[in-house]
From Swiss-Prot:
Organism for this UniProt entry: Pisum sativum (Garden pea)
GO cellular component term, pick one: photosystem I
Topology within the bilayer: Multi-pass membrane protein
Annotated binding of chlorophyll b 3, by residue: S156, E172
Domain of life per record: Eukaryota
Protein name: Chlorophyll a-b binding protein 215, chloroplastic
């Protein structure tokens, strides 16, 4: 019983904290709407990133903060000019989407930069530029993972597409629709087997890690947008663009390319 209580406190915060507002989260389940009530416990007040005295998006010059942005959730800087968080159900859905996209963006940013960085340091494994790597499947011989045909050898784009749809569709459908493996777990921060290092065991540290995850995730989403723009404008990967900028900052920067860029040329 004591062990169970300790584990429960690691995910809900310290005993005696004021419970926050109830949020209704609508979740699709194979075409049928399913509503679940979830009460969120306010994060540890010791953290400077939560509560009414948390940092705001413009610091002391921030305008009046909406009443529904109380600092209860990580990443809340009091900015909602468009009123996207006014509806509790929409707010809950948007928070879930932001966390998930943040995690994908962090993985994507690593995948866009790490292979190119390795190639710059002498590691050879075929095409390293992220937006060119996938096209190797159309080349003679197909696409070899890490340039090694003994690992994953892909020759059919249709097979890759079907595999992606089946595997990702199954996992995402299970996450959205729910299932026995997820019963009783927070859909965003499940813990347990998903936290093998026990990083969320301490509620104060857990509250800080939630903020760090969102801050880095937001940066990663902007980075991915920048990688797409760089690919369209320069036709180079992010590491090569960085090298070019360091070598000649005046000629290789966003302003220089924006003033000279002609679509289609």
């Amino acid at each position: 019983m004591a062990t169970s209580a300790i584990q429960q406190s690691a995910f809900t915060g310290k005993t005696g904290l004021r419970q926050g507002n109830e949020f209704i989260r609508k979740r699709g389940n194979f075409g049928q709407a399913r509503f679940t009530m979830r009460r969120t416990v306010k994060s540890a007040p010791e953290s400077i990133w939560y509560g009414p005295d948390r940092p705001k998006y413009l610091g002391p010059f921030s305008e009046q903060i909406p009443s529904y942005l109380t600092g209860e959730f990580p990443g809340d800087y009091g900015w909602d000019t468009a009123g996207l968080s006014a509806d509790p159900e929409t707010f809950a859905r948007n928070r879930e989407l932001e966390v998930i996209h943040s995690r994908w963006a962090m993985l994507g940013a690593l995948g866009c930069t790490f292979p190119e960085l390795l190639e710059k340091n002498g590691v050879k494994f075929g095409e390293a530029v992220w937006f060119k790597a996938g096209s190797q499947i159309f080349a003679e011989g197909g696409l070899d993972y890490l340039g090694n045909p003994n690992l994953i050898h892909a020759q059919s784009i249709l097979a890759i597409w079907a595999t992606q749809v089946v595997l990702m569709g199954f996992v995402e459908g299970y996450r959205v629709g729910g299932g026995p493996l997820g019963e009783g777990l927070d859909p965003l921060y499940p813990g347990g087997a998903f936290d093998p290092l026990g990083l969320a065991d301490d509620p104060d540290s857990f509250a800080e890690l939630k903020v760090k995850e969102l801050k880095n995730g937001r940066l990663a989403m902007f980075s991915m947008f920048g990688f797409f723009v760089q690919a369209i404008v320069t036709g180079k990967g992010p590491i090569q663009n960085l090298y070019d900028h360091v070598a000649d900052p005046v000629a290789n920067n966003a302003w220089a390319f924006a003033t000279n860029f002609v679509p289609g040329q």
